[in-house]
C-alpha cells in the first residue's frame, strides 16, 4: 500500500532543503544511500562514469522511456511516489515484452527550482520500491535543472536467453493472439482523476470519493509489469512467436506486430474480455468499451 497521507501540516513546520544547497553530487550521494544491490551481474553501480554489467551466453536488452510533466503526467493528482514507481514499471514491462528479465535501471531527472529535496525523496521512494519489488538494481543516471517542471528518463537493462528472445517480427500465419489481462482500466482511471481535478478547480472544498473507482485509479497510478507471465512461460517451456507490451492501446500494438511480421490479423470484439467495472464506468462516462480497450493504453499487459 502506497498510501499518500496529507503531510501539508508537517511541511509547514519543516524547513525544506533547496537543491542548490546540496548540489548535483551531493544529491547523487543522497540518493545512493538508499540504493541496494540485488544482482551479482551488477559489478559497478552508481558513482562511476558508467555502470559495469557482466553477461555470458545471454543477450542484453536495453530500453528507454521519458516522462514529461504536463505531457505524460499531472502532479495535481499524481503523487511523486507513484510516478517514480510507474516510471520504473513501464520500462520493466518493455523488457518483459522481449521475454527477458530486467536487472538494472538508470534514472535521469531534470527538475525546476520549485522542487525541494524532500519532494524528490518521494519520487525516489517510489523508484526504490519498484526496484525492490522487481529485484532490479538502480545503477546510475543524471540530474540537471529544467526551466519548468519535471522530466524523468528511465533506461532499463535486462537479459534474455538468445534462444528465447521474442520480437515483434516473429508472428506467423494462424497464430493465436493472446492478451495477459484486463485492458482499458488505466485509461478510465485517468478519466476519473481528470474529472475529479475539474470538480476540485470549481470547488476546492470538495472531497473526491475514489473508492468506487479504486481498481481503475490504481491501474493508472500504480501499474505492475507482468514479470509473472515471463516466469510462467519459462516454467512451462513456452516461447511465443512474438510479443509486445500494451503501453499505447491494443490496436496500435497489434499493428506494430503485424507491420514487423508482415502479417495481417483478425480481432473478434466478442472475444475481447470486458471487465464489469470497465462496462459500468464506460456507461457513466458515455464511452464505447471497445474503443477504450483498443486505444486506451498504459495497461502494461503483454
Segments (PLM) and residue ranges:
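Helix-biased detector of long, well-ordered alpha-helical tracts
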Residues: 2-302
